[in-house]
């Protein structure tokens, strides 16, 4: 019996347990809240907010405010200096470095031992459990996993404490048995210089029997392309004939799908989306025919949701899981065993089902364009680009968009800077298709575009090859979990990129 067959039997009880998500979702979530509040009683934060007096969800909402990173920053800084029992019991040794706030270059998200095992690793195990359930003929464990991670560094002078990309923290603490199935070597996986790392990963893994790959689509694509260059082959299956699945997350896969399908032409290749972030592991695509993800309810994560239109209100409506509506955009609020209490994570989601609870990621609360009342979100952008690519034979590698508030002719428009891996047959047609489709799916954008009065036709600027990587490198953010900001009301990133595009 092969290793995968043995593993499938090991995962069978969990596969059955996950069926509870269909039967008692609200009950599961309220058990999670009870557990988190009980643990929180042992902390300074819990004493300040009278956790001992919390007996139900209503008490919880009265005693605990909605928090952004700024509200928790001082407590997190104290934890980084070794203080214990601040937001979560005990000493927190690991901090996941995430993209920054208005006031800081980076956020440092605490990762407790409980969070590591009861959120992040549990999520990783469930991805495998659901994949094996859907693919009984899999030979996943008969080869190696290529896990693309970031890097880490010591945290102040706290012994054994680390700061870095979440992926690096996960690799550093991985179960020794799981480590036997992973490539590349840990020293390579945790290198900080992405260009060096990409080359070494390609060289180390080229002759391995890789059956599955995990990572952010943009960075993984870069590694695969480098491996093709070194091997002299055209398609991945010529190097890894047993590759069967890409577990991806971090950014939308849509703009990269065609490039992966061109590179990996095996009919047996699968793609499975996960929603794992520095703050936690939240969703898994449980059905390959449905792009929506199953909300994972029995981890150490309690969920709440704010209607997107109220996210900046002084007293927004906040609902638990049972209060969500299908088809509505929500900002997600989480409470976790990493000491994040009613934390506004910054992502926006839309539920497609409540039996079970399934959702799609629609964007970021800070990544949108609403300069003229058009309310363009990332979900609109991704769908518009996918349509324009389909109509013109293009493939998008990276992009960003920002408003032009008023040019020399007193005209306003959206400006899109796009790096193509496959240029469109006709750039003007690409822009027309994008503009047309955005009007089809966003009535606010359509209204502002009406008769070119408020908004002119969007502008597409072609980025030179490597522009976005050069920009990220200039900012010390090449590789790992760093992402190009897609949409912004500010022109700061756009102006920097346009200037760099001339060099």
Question: Which positions does each model-derived feature cover?
Answer:
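Ser/Thr-glycine-rich phosphate-binding loops at phosphate-binding pockets of nucleotides
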Residues: 95-104, 277-279, 351
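Conserved AMP-binding loop of ANL adenylate-forming enzymes
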Residues: 129-178
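Short glycine-rich loop/turn motifs that provide flexible caps or phosphate-binding loops at active sites
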Residues: 99, 148-149, 214, 275
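Active-site glycine/GP-rich loop and adjacent strand/helix microenvironment
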Residues: 1-52, 60-67, 75-78, 82, ...
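Active-site diphosphate/adenylate-binding microenvironment
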Residues: 27, 31-95, 106-111, 118, ...
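Gly/lys/ser-thr-rich phosphate-binding loops in alpha/beta enzymes
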Residues: 101, 106-111, 122-143, 381-393
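Short strand->helix junction
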Residues: 114-117, 423-424
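Non-catalytic, beta-rich accessory domains that mediate macromolecular interactions or localization
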Residues: 84-85, 101-115, 238, 245, ...
